[in-house]
Amino acid sequence: MSSARCGRRDAAAITAVAVAVAVAVTGCQVAAARPAQSRTARHRPLSSPSTVVQAPARSSGPRPRIMIVGDSITQGSSGDYTWQYRLYEHLLADGVRPRMVGPYGWLYNNVANVQKDHSYADPNFQHANDAAWGMALFREKDVIGRKVATYRPDYLLVLLGLNDLFWFGFGQPVMAANLASFIAAARAARPHIRIVFGLIPPDIHQRKPAFAASVAGFNKTIASTAKRLSTKASPIAVAPDGSGINVAADLWDGTHPNANGEIRIAAGFADVLASRFHLGHAYPTPYPILPTGPLVHPKLTVRPSHTARQAVLSWKLAPGAGSYFIYIKDVTHGDTTFTRLPFPLPAAKDPWTAGLLTSGDTYSFKVQACKGVDCGAFSNPASVTAP
């Protein structure tokens, strides 16, 4: 805070104020927030969406019908592209015109903790699917037959099981039985369905040896079950566990993928669709390195407070941003660069009062939106003269 020049005597006090008001994003480790383009919320089971947003198609036509089945890793949250978007765009570029089907088609609002958010980073894709935060294999096995009968997918792309292991602690015999039941139910509704199972990708919880062993065991179960139950009429393939996901770089909260993690999950499924089913080509490598963090720039306004030496900041929230860093410089004192306050503010702290300013000095502020540990778009700078 030394170069913010809010009065050298008050620098420590300003830092103390920032510490007092800054709290971690719900479930996220914001203390390790990353700057834009660099690289933890727990995987909570939440209520699944219930409203059907896509009516069953009357005719399949020549386009392959794909239904993606998954949990929060697949559904995504506010401001995301999602890995479904990455796969869909890849297939389109390959000349494949997939028809994405399923009962859902929206994001989870990770800030307000509600469903039916439509703030996709790019909404111009087919986002129908069967993916929801909290979805678990042991529940989905009982309803997948009805969904397959309704939406008639040619391909099921499935990434499930993490919630079963992490939240419910099922052992491998139960997981294997549930997996077999899922396959049987899907085939009963559509005997020639093609299924691709994704392996559980790496996440921060797998740093614990016991949970890592549980995930590794289930991934082996997926592979062995696919081999055992695959048939010529209804083949089953297995996609890799995220094509080399780096937990520190590719997940915004240690579990859910950012833009770079999305690409790696999509690539795993794309490669299997190409090699096993001749649907498109393998995902091109090397994978691009994409910017991470919120993409929408917050709109900042600032005004003098009615209290001396204070200013009130408010900003329009960016989709998915659960926290914001405040940057400040004292223009009157001659500061040429912004100094970031040491701790992020949660979204609920908008508006926020900056205190311990020097009366009569003009200050410039800006805020940076962060989603978990990924910090992205900056606001416009806004200036005020301290009362």
Language model region names:
Residues 325-358:
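Recognizes extended acidic, P/S/T-rich segments that occur
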Residues 1-36:
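Secretory targeting and sorting signals
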Residues 354-373:
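Beta-strand-rich modules
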Residues 159-163, 184-217, 240-242:
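Active-site segments of SGNH/GDSL-like serine hydrolases
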Residues 202-240, 262-263, 268:
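Substrate-gating cap/lid alpha-helix
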Residues 278-320, 359, 374-387:
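Pro/Thr/Ser/Gly-rich low-complexity, intrinsically disordered linker/stalk tracts
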Residues 74-177:
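Conserved SGNH/GDSL esterase-like catalytic core that processes O-acyl groups on lipids
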Residues 69, 250-297:
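Histidine-centered active-site loop/cap adjacent to the catalytic His
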